Amino acid sequence: YNLNTTSTRRANAIAFDVREKGRPMREGGSLTGKILRYENGSPIMQPGTLKATKAIGWFIDEYGIAQVSMNMTNINVTPLHKAFDEVCRAAAERGVRVTGTEIVGLIPKRVLIEAGEYFLRKQQRSTGIPEEDIIKIAIHSMGLEDLKPFNPREKVIEYLLEDEDKTAKLVDLTVSEFANETSRESPAPGGGTIAAYMGALGAALGTMVANLSAHKRGWDERWEEFSQWADRGQDIVRRALHLVDEDTEAFNRIMDCLLYTSPSPR
């Protein structure tokens, strides 16, 4: 977590406030007091506020700022957005501000989805919006582009795996390309694929209504009710879009099997 300070000492203090291990307890609660120890000589630790985290403060020469570097050992216990808010709180108590977040390595997609939904709920906004919009909220809320550009296609595990799959998909076509492909003299894509696509569009329209209702003046107290309907709508959209290609692929597999089992001409 990037800080608006160059003080490694301040960064360390914040890290010790939040990391699970915490800091050694000292006599009188003073920073310079003697470390309190158990009979076996090991220091008595005052636990930090975040479970399943390890953290330390350091100075980054490349950017000229101090940072709380955190290793999150179990995101089910302490998710990224919870750690971000807690570091912000601890920093503010010491007169420091968190300016952004740097993610080193790859992350599961759900980390950003959960973060985006968390910050949307804090704003009392509907979470039933497209996946890429939720991820944008997460990026902006936690300042993931504070020091350098953040490209989800390069940082999210699922997106990297998707990009490695070079199989052409119908859902990646434009509307006109999809219509043209359907009109060609080939049996697929056919009725099942078109029905799935129409179902996705119908669910998308219903989701639009739920999202508009969630933010309608006078219905502020009902935002969560409409958000739940929008979430259900987005789930239907995703499943229907999956079926767009699944129907065509299933038909093609059947045709391949029929071709394989057909008797060879004599």
Predicted regions and their residues:
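Short, hydrophobic/aliphatic alpha-helical segments
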Residues: K169-P189
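Long, contiguous binding/interaction regions
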Residues: Y1-D172
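Conserved small/polar residues in nucleotide/adenosyl-binding loops
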Residues: Y260-P265
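A structural-propensity feature for long, helix-poor, extended segments
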Residues: R217-D256
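Conserved phosphate/anionic-ligand binding catalytic regions in large, soluble enzymes, centered on
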Residues: R184-T207
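Amphipathic, well-ordered alpha-helical segments in soluble domains
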Residues: F178, L201-M208, L243-E246, A250
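Transmembrane signal-anchor/signal-peptide helices with a preference for the extracytoplasmic
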Residues: V209-R217
